[in-house]
Amino acid sequence: MTKIAGLGDESYGYIAGQGSGCIINAIMASTDAGKKMVESELTEDIVNSDEFANAFKTTAKLDQANGSEHTTDDNGNLMAEFNTNGKVGVLFNGVWNASGIDASLTDAIEPALFPGNIAIASAGGGLAVANNMSDEKTELALEFIKYMTSAEVQEKIFTGVQANPCNTTVDLNALAEQSGDAATMKLAKACAQVNEADTIVIDMKYTWGSDVNKAIINALMECAVSGTDIDARFEALQKELLALIG
């Protein structure tokens, strides 16, 4: 952030707020204990843990230094400043955003993992088969899952949707070269980084819940305001989270 601010051209470090949730996620995943916490349901012990306190306060200090004007609860609100204007150094937005990059910035933008070679990767709700169906329906459901995860469909996930396919047999580099699109080639590089990361952790909103995720992001957005007492705001957040989990 210091180097970018030193450019003196109104550039800034990163899009905070929604993106700050990713920073907490990655900091938690940097230790075995923290990673286990993120991958399980939120409990009172986790809320009161040193790992969570360190992750929140470290992120809050970064957000405060980055500036409250660069904070949003939806990255889409500031997306153009990364994809089109090139005003922001880092966008925490996953591998799927390649199609939004302006052609003039394609050469300048590079994918990267979090420090410690950590990647956040989730399949969202994923694909599941309901219980208590007939054998015939279960067989059809499994056939559908087999099709959806096939190379044929997953190639389209990469080239059309521009997301990281779940089928690791798909040759992303070959597809990217075949497309001839520079942004798609960067997408292939980003997917490879995620798939080969030393630590791959789930997005905490899928384990801790969207309400908890929103509460954490709101607290961080408040901490981004200069002069906010981070310790006091964290204590308030702990009470909010304990109320949410019952």
Label for each model-derived stretch:
Residues 89-94:
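Paired acidic/hydrophobic, glycine-rich loop segments that form the ligand-binding mouth/hinge
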Residues 2-3, 41-72:
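Glycine-centered hinge/linker elements that transmit conformational signals in sensory
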Residues 103-164:
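Extracytoplasmic/periplasmic substrate-recognition and gating elements
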Residues 13, 34-55, 103-104, 113-119, ...:
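Short, solvent-exposed loop/beta-turn-alpha elements that line the ligand-binding surface or hinge
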Residues 1-11, 80, 97-104, 242:
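Pocket-flanking alpha-helical
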Residues 70-84:
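Short helix-initiation/N-cap motifs at beta->coil->alpha
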Residues 159-218, 222:
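Long, aromatic- and glycine/proline-rich binding clefts that accommodate carbohydrate-like moieties
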Residues 1-44, 88:
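Extracytoplasmic/periplasmic solute-binding protein
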